């Protein structure tokens, strides 16, 4: 790059910074100064900042967009006072919940912040097979991600847990995320620091949780148990393999490096900078990078909203199936309780919960919500309400002990065939093609997975013997 071009790009980036700072409130400007100082101290001063690499994980939500805007402002602020600044690695972890729409939002944010073509920014798309530079001109990056394996894990977990939302939707996602994070760290140059926007105690709780589960699963104590966050991530990767082995699913080829566990990444916690006293929902900075939006307009693809609404949806469907209630009764009860539990909490997720409770407070609005959530689950996992209802009844585990009750309640016309269906679950040669197709249709699972469930037991959350039960038993957030 010529000296003239460098000067021109420096001018452009300072114009970007000037425009971005115009959206910062006074408290946000103070928070930005604190963030800059924190990064400089972690790097060892201005003289070392040019060789310092900071990584942030982007999961598609507004918290991530807000954090990214601050980091970009910090990066450009340092560039304005010294010839060099830190390298910012933005890792987009490609999981099914990062939909085409979410990816398009990330692209909008990157355009507004001028991160494309900036040599001090590494924008990565990370999936199970590869890590690649994210380019706005590569359309494949924004195609829908296939999720057959993901759907199978979620539905099997749903059957084993009788549809407990956190055990059904969250644990498989958590375990698989560890490998994506490690791939993002191992790509290219060494990562010096990870940005963490959650409360300071969060990573400690995460590390302790994963280590407790690993011990429960029989992993012998070694160096990984005595160190910090990076070691916990490596244990989490092992648990992801355990989870797939347990469900008798194929374990992807391990493409990760074999670096030693003592290469801990520095954690730069920015919770007090970005989350403590700032009302993110009304921030002009967020409006700028995200575009105009309104939380009252349903945005189920917002991660914090999706977690709440999926749990509410499961409670609504469970009430219909097992108690004879109308759908809106269970949903409204869940949202009302969640809003009350978060009444005095002003963190972003709590703000979202309270706004959701206020927005979906009539049967008509909740029925519209149901259609949106059903569409969302179908887009993410190819999961229908029929599949979810089947998981809630869990009719195939414990050698199909609940099959008769399930058929009597949901498919009385199929009661005559229960013995044939049971045989289809027991052995391949005894199954008719029609029975197999029907079982796969109502469950969303291949018959091979249904036969695995046939030989498994429902999760006893108090005993902690299975992997799901161990995750639940030690989960610090299972009641949140």
Where are these regions (language model features)?
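Nucleotide-activated chemistry modules centered on ATP-dependent adenylation/adenylyltransferase
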Residues: 1-51, 87-111, 117-480
């Amino acid at each position: 790059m010529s000296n003239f071009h460098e000067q021109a790009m420096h001018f452009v980036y300072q114009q970007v910074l000037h425009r971005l700072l115009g959206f910062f409130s006074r408290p946000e400007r103070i928070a930005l100064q604190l963030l800059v100082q924190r990064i400089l101290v972690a790097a060892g001063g201005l003289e070392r900042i040019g060789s310092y690499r900071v990584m942030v994980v982007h999961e598609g939500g507004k918290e991530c967009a807000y954090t990214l805007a601050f980091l970009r402002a910090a990066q450009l602020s340092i560039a304005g006072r010294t010839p060099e600044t830190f390298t910012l690695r933005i890792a987009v972890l490609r999981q099914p919940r990062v939909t085409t729409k979410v990816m398009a939002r990330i692209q909008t944010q990157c355009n507004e912040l001028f991160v494309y073509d900036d040599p001090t920014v590494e924008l990565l798309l990370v999936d199970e097979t590869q890590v690649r530079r994210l380019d706005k001109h590569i359309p494949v990056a924004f195609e829908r991600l296939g999720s057959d394996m993901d759907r199978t894990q979620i539905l099997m977990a749903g059957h084993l847990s009788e549809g407990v939302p956190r055990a059904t939707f969250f644990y498989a996602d958590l375990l698989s995320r560890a490998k994506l994070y490690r791939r993002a760290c191992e790509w290219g140059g060494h990562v010096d620091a990870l940005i963490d926007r959650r409360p300071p105690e969060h990573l400690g709780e995460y590390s302790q949780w994963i280590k407790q589960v690993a011990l429960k699963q029989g992993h012998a104590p070694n160096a990984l148990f005595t160190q910090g966050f990076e070691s916990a991530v490596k244990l989490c990767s092992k648990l992801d393999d355990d989870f797939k082995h347990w469900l008798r699913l194929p374990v992807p080829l391990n493409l990760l490096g074999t670096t030693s566990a003592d290469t801990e990444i520095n954690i730069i916690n920015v919770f007090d900078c970005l989350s403590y006293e700032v009302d993110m929902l009304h921030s002009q900075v967020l409006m700028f990078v995200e575009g105009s939006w309104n939380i009252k307009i349903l945005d189920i693809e917002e991660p914090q909203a999706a977690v709440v609404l999926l749990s509410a949806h499961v409670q609504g469907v469970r009430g219909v199936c097992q108690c004879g209630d109308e759908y809106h009764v269970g949903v409204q009860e869940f949202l009302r309780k969640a809003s009350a539990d978060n009444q005095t909490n002003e963190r972003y997720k709590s703000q979202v919960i309270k706004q959701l409770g206020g927005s979906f407070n009539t049967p008509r609005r909740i029925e519209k919500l149901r259609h949106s959530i059903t569409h969302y689950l179908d887009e993410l996992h190819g999961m229908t309400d029929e599949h979810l209802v089947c998981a809630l009844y869990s009719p195939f585990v414990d050698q199909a002990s609940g099959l008769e009750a399930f058929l009597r309640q949901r498919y009385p016309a199929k009661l005559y065939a229960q013995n044939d269906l049971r045989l289809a679950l027991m052995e391949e040669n005894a199954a008719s093609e029609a029975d197999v197709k029907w079982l796969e249709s109502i469950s969303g699972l291949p018959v091979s997975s249904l036969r695995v469930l046939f030989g498994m037991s429902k999760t006893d959350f108090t005993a902690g013997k299975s992997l799901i039960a161990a995750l639940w038993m030690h989960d610090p957030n299972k009641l949140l």
